[in-house]
Amino acid sequence: MACVCKAHVGKPAPEFQATAVVDGAFKEVKLSDYKGKYVVLFFYPLDFTFVCPTEIVAFSDRAAEFHKLNCEVLGVSVDSQFTHLAWINTPRKEGGLGPLNIPLLADVTRKLSSDYGVLKEDEGIAYRGLFVIDGKGVLRQVTINDLPVGRSVDEALRLVQAFQYTDEHGEVCPAGWTPGSDTIKPNVDDSKEYFSKHN
């Protein structure tokens, strides 16, 4: 079966419904539940592995920073909700997750991984995909890492802040932009103000 990616930047993000572990309980979660909020949707290969807990714990520990931006963070793997719960119930010192501040979604059918173009078909697991979806449900950013390298929570947070800034102000954010930094007015004459200051 060939993977047909339905996730395209600038287009509506593929809708999904999945069982998640939320605050230690099972709950059905849909993308549409988060309408009006930004969503950082990140895929990881498998529970009870090595890089994955470092990413999940890092996102969970900083969930409040995303919430301040009206943004939810959702983790997804091809494991079942039962495996997610077992991993959450395993102490961090033993390679577990411990209590989390973010939901973990179960993608046992691999439909979500396939729709978002991160399914590694020969192994039946997901690559490390990260998707930023805006409050209108439009996919704004995609990053997909190969399996051995984790992602940066700082960069995910910066991307949400940058897209929210451009949405609100109509200006564009240069490379490495952080809140409070200069932005660029997106027309030939006004952009010279930025370039004359920074070159």
Swiss-Prot record:
Gene3D superfamilies registered for this protein in UniProt: Glutaredoxin (3.40.30.10)
One GO term describing the cellular component: cytosol
Residue list for modification Phosphoserine: S113
CDD domains: PRX_Typ2cys (cd03015)
Keywords: Acetylation, Antioxidant, Cytoplasm, Disulfide bond, Oxidoreductase, Peroxidase, Phosphoprotein, Redox-active center
First-listed, main subcellular location of the protein, grouped into a coarse class: cytoplasm
Record's catalysed reaction(s): a hydroperoxide + [thioredoxin]-dithiol = an alcohol + [thioredoxin]-disulfide + H2O
PROSITE patterns on file: THIOREDOXIN_2
Record's miscellaneous remark: The active site is a conserved redox-active cysteine residue, the peroxidatic cysteine (C(P)), which makes the nucleophilic attack on the peroxide substrate. The peroxide oxidizes the C(P)-SH to cysteine sulfenic acid (C(P)-SOH), which then reacts with another cysteine residue, the resolving cysteine (C(R)), to form a disulfide bridge. The disulfide is subsequently reduced by an appropriate electron donor to complete the catalytic cycle. In this typical 2-Cys peroxiredoxin, C(R) is provided by the other dimeric subunit to form an intersubunit disulfide.
Posttranslational mods: The enzyme can be inactivated by further oxidation of the cysteine sulfenic acid (C(P)-SOH) to sulphinic acid (C(P)-SO2H) instead of its condensation to a disulfide bond. It can be reactivated by forming a transient disulfide bond with sulfiredoxin SRXN1, which reduces the cysteine sulfinic acid in an ATP- and Mg-dependent manner. Acetylation increases resistance to transition to high molecular-mass complexes. Deacetylated by HDAC6 which decreases reducing activity.
Enzyme class: oxidoreductase
Entry superkingdom: Eukaryota
Protein name, UniProt field: Peroxiredoxin-2
Keyword flag Transcription regulation: no
Chain positions with N6-acetyllysine modification: K197
Any one GO MF annotation of this record: thioredoxin peroxidase activity
Domain Thioredoxin per the UniProt entry, residue ranges: 7-165
Localisation per UniProt entry: Cytoplasm
Subunit structure: Homodimer; disulfide-linked, upon oxidation. 5 homodimers assemble to form a ring-like decamer. Interacts with TIPIN.
EC number: 1.11.1.24
